[in-house]
């Protein structure tokens, strides 16, 4: 078992091991004790792993029940969030209680935000079941729900008590969902390591899962420890997200998060080339790797359709939008621009 420790405002461990789901109750009990708990999951994940985690927690002495909701970004809203709160209240979960998030990024966001706000905060544990959530969204304590105006506009920072990553569960993922998570993996390489980028180019991701998980989680851990509340260095993790979130929202979330981030990274890198921040070969190598991982690289919407969404993004501060701009593979820089210049960057990124 690989353990990665996160020294945040609430320190916790991320445990990586094949088959750890069967011992979930035992591992959670070590950290949280065995008390009352609610497992929050999505309807596609629960039939696969719900009973395993539920029985494991019952065997460890937990008084545990479950709540499931329809999968997909469309469920990441205030209505479903309220349903989770009502489920907690109906089960009389106290401040000593626990929420377990079993699922992908949407589940982690929803369960985490409920944990942050129910009774002004209770503990929660992340059991991510997608590549995207294992390498990214389950690490760092960001929780949120969407509004019609955009993604993640209502949320809180809430560090988990424990994260359990089981690489075995990724074997059940259909290729589109698996490769969707690879966008965040490639993002990590673009941010921090040319060598890791080359590893991704040479070897199939399914053949190096543990290596991918350990690199991406450790990279994000380092950034979170430096800037837990996203005021400086952590903004780097938004590479591809400023424009990507706009693409995702413009599609009414029919374009998945990873695919949107892939498009967003290409847009930002193309703009960086045109504005002299990096060389053309950086863009060429990025596009080639994304295509190898079956990820989209073309901008599906005009700049006019994306503009207002970018300006209302949660990363916009007043009249300033901070862009994460590649300089080379393994290094990016923060570039603050005025909101009036967003259209120019969108156009430079390939949005007509």
What are the language-model segments listed below?
Residues 1-97:
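ATP/NTP phosphate-donor binding region
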Residues 15, 113-202:
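A glycine/threonine-rich phosphate-anchoring loop and its flanking beta-alpha core
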Residues 31, 92-94, 117-118, 146-147, ...:
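Solvent-exposed alpha-helices and their adjacent loops that cap or buttress functional pockets
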Residues 93, 159-163, 168-169, 175, ...:
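Generic secondary-structure signature for well-ordered alpha-helical cores
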Residues 106-113, 134-135, 246:
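Short glycine/serine/threonine-rich phosphate/pyrophosphate-binding segments
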Residues 183-185, 277-352:
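C-terminal charged capping/lid subdomain of soluble metabolic enzymes
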Residues 198-304:
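Active-site segments that bind and position negatively charged phosphate/pyrophosphate groups
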